C-alpha cells in the first residue's frame, strides 16, 4: 500500500471517529428533544430530520473536503470512495456502539417506550388539530401501538440482517459521495 492510500485510510478512520461521535451526540440530543423538550407535533417531526439528516450531511461534506485537501487536493474516484467508505463505516460502528448498545441498553433502557409514547402523543395532537373524530384518533393510535409491538420482536438474525443492510447502504452512499468529491 502506497503512502497516499495509507494516508487516505488513516484520515478516514480519524474522520469516522469524529463523525461517529457527532452523530451519536446528535442521536442522543434528538431522543431527548422528542421525548422531553418538544411538545409541538411539527417540531416532533422536524427535529429528528434536522438532527439526523441536515447536520450530519453538513459534517460529511466538511470531512470530505478536509480529507481531499489533506492529500493534496486531488484524489481519484477509487481513493475518494475508499476514504469516504472508511469514514462512514467507522462512524457507523461508533454510533452503533455508542447509541444502540451503550445508550439504549444502559443509560435509557426504556427509551423505546418513551419514544413511542411521544410519537403517539404527537400523532394524537396532529389528528386533534385536524378535527378528526375521537373514534378515528383511537383507531390510529391502536394501529400505531400494534406496529410498535411488532417492532419489539427483534432477534439476533434480524439484528445481523440490519447491520448487513446498513453496510451495503453505507457502501452505496460512499460511491455517491466518492463520485461527487473526486477531483
List where the protein language model places each region.
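Transmembrane alpha-helical insertion/packing segments
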Residues: 1-70
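Alpha-helical transmembrane segments of multi-pass membrane proteins
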Residues: 10-18, 82-91, 161
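Alpha-helical transmembrane segments of multipass membrane proteins
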Residues: 22-30, 55-56, 91-95, 99, ...
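Individual transmembrane alpha-helix segments
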Residues: 142-168
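Low-complexity, acidic polar-rich segments
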Residues: 128-150
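Hydrophobic secretory-pathway targeting helix
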Residues: 68-69, 77-78, 82-100
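Juxtamembrane interface at the cytosolic side of transmembrane helices
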Residues: 69, 172-183
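Functional transmembrane-helix hotspots
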Residues: 96-130
Amino acid at each position: 500500500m502506497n503512502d497516499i492510500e495509507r494516508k487516505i485510510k488513516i484520515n478516514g478512520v480519524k474522520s469516522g471517529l469524529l463523525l461517529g461521535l457527532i452523530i451519536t451526540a446528535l442521536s442522543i440530543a434528538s431522543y431527548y428533544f422528542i421525548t422531553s423538550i418538544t411538545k409541538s407535533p411539527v417540531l416532533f417531526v422536524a427535529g429528528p430530520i434536522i438532527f439526523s439528516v441536515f447536520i450530519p450531511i453538513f459534517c460529511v461534506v466538511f470531512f470530505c473536503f478536509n480529507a481531499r485537501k489533506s492529500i493534496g487536493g486531488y484524489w481519484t474516484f477509487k481513493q475518494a470512495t475508499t476514504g469516504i467508505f472508511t469514514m462512514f463505516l467507522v462512524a457507523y460502528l461508533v454510533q452503533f456502539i455508542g447509541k444502540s448498545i451503550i445508550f439504549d441498553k444502559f443509560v435509557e433502557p426504556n427509551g423505546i417506550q418513551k419514544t413511542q409514547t411521544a410519537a403517539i402523543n404527537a400523532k394524537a395532537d396532529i389528528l386533534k388539530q385536524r378535527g378528526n373524530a375521537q373514534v378515528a384518533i383511537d383507531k390510529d393510535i391502536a394501529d400505531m401501538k400494534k406496529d410498535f409491538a411488532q417492532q419489539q420482536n427483534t432477534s439476533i438474525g434480524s439484528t445481523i440482517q440490519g447491520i448487513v443492510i446498513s453496510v451495503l447502504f453505507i457502501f452505496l452512499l460512499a460511491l455517491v459521495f466518492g463520485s461527487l468529491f473526486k477531483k
